[in-house]
Each structure stands twice: as C-alpha cells, then as structure tokens.
C-alpha cells in the first residue's frame, strides 16, 4: 500500500492531473516561491529578452521571469494539462498582452525554431526527463548562440520523503553539469543557494 501511494504521489509531482493534481499545483505555488526567485535572479534577464521555461508548473517562476523581461517575451511548455490551465489563469494578463505563451508540450521535441531564445530555465523538472542529454540538446537547439540554460534541483541527499526511483531520477549538481557537458554546453558552473536561507538548492548553468 505504501509503495503504491509513493508511486502515485511521485507520478502526480511529475505530471499533476485531476483534483489531486490541482492540490499538488497549489502546494508548488506556495512552496517554490523561493526556488523561483533565486533561480530567476541568476539569469541576468534583460528587458527585451526572449525566455523559455521548461515545466512551468503553476506558473510562479514564469510570472517572475516575465516581470524581469518587461519588454520581452516568455514562452513555457509543460506536459501537464492541469498545470497549463493553472499557470494560464495566473498569468492571464501577460498572455492577453502578447508577452507570454504557455502551452502543453514535451521537452524532447520543442515546437520552436532554432535560435529562438536568449535564455531557458527549468525548476524541478529534469527528474522526469527520460533521456536528459537529448532533452538538453533540444533546448540548446532553440537557444541563440551563447544563450543561457539554467536547471535548478534539490540535491538527491536532501529529498524527504523517499520517491519512486522508477519514475523520478534525483541528481547532484555535478551530475547534471556532466550531462550539460555531454550535450555540448560550455562555461558550465553550479551555484548553491545560500546556506543561511535554509533551502537546499543547486542551479546548473551553461552556455549554448
């Protein structure tokens, strides 16, 4: 019974759906504000930048990025229809004004032309990518030359409770940095959230 519950919750975290998915999304919206603010602060967003978020969830980080790119454009893809609906409601004004586009999609096959974005980022999404190197290459394809990619994770030893390892792959930052290298990124570095904030995050950054 416990294993089935763990599997169900892990699946919902990766692809929220239905009433429980809405609950997960609300929890993400409340619990990941720091993660979103910290990650976006590392992106050095310019007012006219074009930005892509992979796995935007309830749309909190997308909203913060859009506020930074005040005269730019933010696109986002998520494979949860429930999260697309929730994030679209949260960001309705930006979408209506043409500053943002949120849609259902798959990181392994991005429906954007080559060199479309200055920056791409993702929070707590890479755990669910079945082939992370190929997904990173696909993101690299849609980044402009020397475009920035940032991936934020919680290090694997900080995860409590346990998750279903058949559904979700946990990482340390240096492991993802190695994936970045295999995918052809350069100037790769790992940033660690300030210990005094008592939030355990690592953000891996690299240039296309």
Please describe what each predicted stretch is.
Residues 50-109:
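Class I SAM-dependent methyltransferase SAM/SAH-binding core
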Residues 168-183:
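Short alpha-helix
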Residues 133-145:
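A short glycine-rich, Lys/Arg-flanked "PGG" loop and its adjoining helix->strand segment in the class I
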Residues 119-131:
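A short SAM/SAH-binding and catalytic strip from SAM-dependent methyltransferases
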Residues 108-119:
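A short acidic, Gly/Pro-enriched loop at the edge of an enzyme's catalytic core
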Residues 20-40, 169:
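Conserved SAM-binding loop and adjacent beta-strand
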Residues 146-153:
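Conserved beta-strand signature within the Rossmann-like core of class I S-adenosyl-L-methionine
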Residues 183, 192-208:
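Core SAM-dependent methyltransferase catalytic element
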């Amino acid at each position: 019974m416990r294993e089935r519950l763990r599997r169900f919750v892990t699946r919902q975290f990766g692809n929220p759906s239905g009433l429980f998915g809405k609950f997960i999304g609300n929890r993400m919206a409340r619990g990941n504000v720091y993660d979103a603010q910290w990650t976006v602060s590392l992106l050095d967003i310019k007012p006219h930048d074009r930005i892509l978020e992979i796995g935007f969830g309830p749309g909190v980080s997308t909203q913060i990025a859009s506020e930074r790119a005040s005269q730019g454009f933010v696109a986002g893809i998520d494979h949860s229809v429930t999260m697309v609906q929730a994030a679209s409601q949260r960001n309705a004004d930006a979408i209506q004004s043409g500053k943002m586009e949120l849609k259902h999609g798959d990181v392994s096959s991005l429906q954007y032309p080559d060199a479309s974005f200055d920056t791409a980022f993702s929070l707590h999404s890479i755990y669910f990518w079945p082939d992370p190197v190929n997904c990173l290459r696909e993101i690299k394809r849609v980044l402009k030359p020397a475009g920035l990619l940032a991936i934020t994770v919680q290090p694997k030893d900080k995860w409590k409770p346990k998750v279903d390892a058949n559904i979700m792959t946990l990482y340390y930052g240096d492991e993802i940095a190695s994936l970045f290298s295999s995918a052809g990124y350069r100037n790769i570095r790992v940033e660690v959230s300030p210990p005094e904030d008592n939030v355990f995050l690592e953000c891996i950054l690299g240039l296309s």
